[in-house]
Swiss-Prot record:
PROSITE patterns: PUA. It is found in: Cytoplasm. The lineage of its organism: Bacteria, Pseudomonadati, Pseudomonadota, Gammaproteobacteria, Alteromonadales. One of its GO terms (cellular component) is cytoplasm. The gene is rlmI. One of its GO terms (molecular function) is rRNA (cytosine) methyltransferase activity. Its EC number is 2.1.1.191. Keywords: Cytoplasm, Methyltransferase, RNA-binding, rRNA processing, S-adenosyl-L-methionine, Transferase. Belongs to the methyltransferase superfamily. RlmI family. Pfam families: Methyltrans_SAM, PUA_3. This is Ribosomal RNA large subunit methyltransferase I.
Amino acid sequence: MTSAVYLQAGRDKSLKRKHPWLFSKAIKKIKGKPGLGDTVTIHDSEGKFLATAAYSPHSQIRARVWSFDEKEVIDQHFFERRLRRALEARSQVIEEGGLTGFRLCAAESDFLPGVTIDKFDNVLVCQLLSAGAERHKGEIVGALMAIFPGMSIYERSDVEVRTKEGLEPIKGALWGNEPTAPVLIAENGFKIEVDIIDGHKTGFYLDQRDSRAALERFSKDKTVLNCFSYTGTFSLYALRGGCKHVTNVDVSQPALDTAKRNVEHNNLDLDKVDFVKQDVFKLLRQYREDGVLFDTIVMDPPKFADNKAQLTGACRGYKDINMIAMQILKPGGTLLTFSCSGLMEQNLFQKVVADAALDAGKDLLIMERLNQAADHPIAGSYPEGFYLKGLICKVY
């Protein structure tokens, strides 16, 4: 028998607005003994049905909603319906970009909490971060096999956040053969190498596709500095845009080696590219000391804040790194700067960048705002799905 969760009076407002999370403090009582990932029904204080959800006894988010339809059964057909809808929603962007790599499912933003799925050519990569996603792993794999017959399915749930759900980090093949070599995907006319097994996250940052395309417009006859370059895909767009030279900077030699191969995959001019293994903060200060200047700088750092306690320090980090970047830009140069920290709201990020300009002694013009690509949608009921913020700035 399905366990039932009953809420405190007045704690049902977010669920009535179809937000997918239920926090432990909102719960009054539980009928039954639900285990890790078990399906439960959620009811208001008067017993009225609100949602069907996955129970997570170890997390502050005690339940994540699967459905607000009382009649909907959480089985393989449920996951197949949700995933087919997610694929259909992305059909236009996939066709327009000639994409063989894209995010198929963006977890809560596609109404499947904890379920992230990326498609890289003929391999589907799953990251299952919630107790419910783990519990229904078999049904999720079955749904993917029905939609994408013949494709391999690989799991990259090797992240510490799973421990908050009482789950162990894990990775490995779920169906088909484990990839023995990097996969090549197509993006806006480029061939891009993706390391599914050992790359960051699921292997590649698909969410920055539109931002990479934006760089192409600010590259003609420019010297470009690509900070935190990872596998160098921003530099591909800079090269196609006609840059004089682009410098990729990252602390990972394997990532830089992949960046070099990406230039070769696309028959671009290696003589116009440098690959620098260095800490970005240290190198920027060295450039400032040596008087090295660039026309265009891409500043795409990793997440600086995983929780609210880290937000103040993250603001300092973003301000410091953007300040130095502005100091090594030529007058009228272009800065493309980003934050992937969901806790860093758009207005706060803009203020941090503006403060960096003041500290740098520069005048700042914000020309455009950027965010995550269209295969990373934001559900109207889940504003937390908006996490990637970008600004294109002119600096004088």
